[in-house]
Amino acid sequence: MSKSITHLVLDTGGIICSSTLLRNSAESFYTIPRVIAEIRDETSRKNFELWGDQVIQRVPKPEFIKKVSEFAKQTGDYSSLSVTDIQILALTYELEVEFNGGDWRLRKYPGQKHINGKPPSNSNSTEDASKPTSSDTASVKETENSDPKSAENEVLEGETTQHSNNKEAHPNTEENKEQEDNEEDDEDDGWITPSNIRKKKAEDGVGESLVQPKHLKVACATTDFSMQNVLLQIGLNLVSSDGFKIQNVKRFVLRCHGCYTVVKDMEKKFCPSCGGNTLIKTTCSINSKGEFQVHLKKNFEWKTRGTKYSLPKPVHGTSNGKGKKNPVLREDQPEYQRAVRRMQRKKEIDLMDEDYLPSLLTGVTKDRMYVQIGAGRKNPNEVRRKKR
């Protein structure tokens, strides 16, 4: 039995679910050491043992990590991707270049319409098969260029002759119409039948648009929507392990809810105009006129609960840097600037580190990759239980 995928890159979700359909869909499987390190609980370890020696661990090259990172920054998904996610995307990119004869069909920036170069000679046959034939295009052009007035006259003539024939053959037309209307109302009560199932699928957006090609050389199995968004915009093949897949690709920007400033740097936490922590991730697009549009949520309300609370007294620094720290409230605070530099440096080192050791071997358990702003996500005015 021939497999539908030759090389499949697995995310953590694809390994944990251990789907039989996923294991039987590809000839070879790839992942990175970070994914194996994320599998910690007993149930997930047992599911990973079902894969046996089928999964090949491989670290992507730094050049592909750099390409994927730059592309994710342009789509606005870079801040939502972890180091593991970026390496999974880079490994898929590397395998696509290796087994598909280069990056001729991949996009270098979002929205690119033309390919990068000529495809290899062995893929010409598949491309020619997907192109429409000259007879098909000619028939389409003929129907488009035909005179609409003559077509309307023919339809009207046909309707008048059919109407006159029906009058002669069926004198009781009103009774027949009432019976037909009643029958149609009884049939179309919302039931899905074999006759209208295609129409229902087309209305729901499920149909031929989601059908995968017969054979894929390289694909990636992930359940993360940010990774799926980057994969589809680059042009890489996507396989969903749990059946949930995005239908439309999106680009994101940050919009300040206080002063309505649009910020394209997705790593920003504070608005560069008003300085508040009021940036919200929103989708954006460019219309046919070339105008930039931001798509806001309908009836959106900014939650003010937990935004007013008492601040502790400022604490002076210590020589060793330990002790209580002042809460981060603005971007120009030294505490925030040091934390941002530390995170950027650590992320760059981890992305380019080929000699990566999992946290199970190094013993590092707590390593936050974000800065707590203010009181954090929890409501500081909420009454909490006392610890015993």
UniProtKB/Swiss-Prot annotation:
Domain of life: Eukaryota
EC number in record: 3.1.-.-
GO molecular function: RNA binding; RNA endonuclease activity; zinc ion binding
Biased amino acid composition, Acidic residues: 177-190
Every PINc domain range: 6-108
SUPFAM superfamilies: NOB1 zinc finger-like
NOB1 Zn finger ranges: 246-317
GO CC annotations on file: cytoplasm; nucleolus; nucleus; preribosome, small subunit precursor
Transmembrane region(s): none
Keywords carried by this UniProt record: Cytoplasm, Endonuclease, Hydrolase, Metal-binding, Nuclease, Nucleus, Ribosome biogenesis, Zinc, Zinc-finger
Record field: compositional bias (Polar residues): 119-138
Stored InterPro entries: NOB1 (IPR039907), Nob1_euk (IPR017117), NOB1_Zf-like_sf (IPR036283), NOB1_Zn-bd (IPR014881), PIN_dom (IPR002716), Ribonuclease_PIN (IPR033411)
GO biological process entries: maturation of SSU-rRNA
Presence of the UniProt keyword Zinc in the record: yes
Alphabetized Gene3D superfamilies for the sequence: 5'-nuclease, Nin one binding (NOB1), Zn-ribbon-like
CDD domains (alphabetical): PIN_Nob1-like
Class of the enzyme per the UniProt entry, highest EC level: hydrolase
First-listed, main subcellular location of the protein, grouped into a coarse class: cytoplasm
Function field: Required for the synthesis of 40S ribosome subunits. Has a role in processing 20S pre-rRNA into the mature 18S rRNA, where it is required for cleavage at the 3' end of the mature 18S rRNA (D-site). Accompanies the 20S pre-rRNA from the nucleus to the cytoplasm.
Subunit-level organization: Component of the small ribosomal subunit, ribosomal RNA processing complex (SSU RRP complex).
Full protein name: 20S-pre-rRNA D-site endonuclease nob1
Organism: Schizosaccharomyces pombe (strain 972 / ATCC 24843)
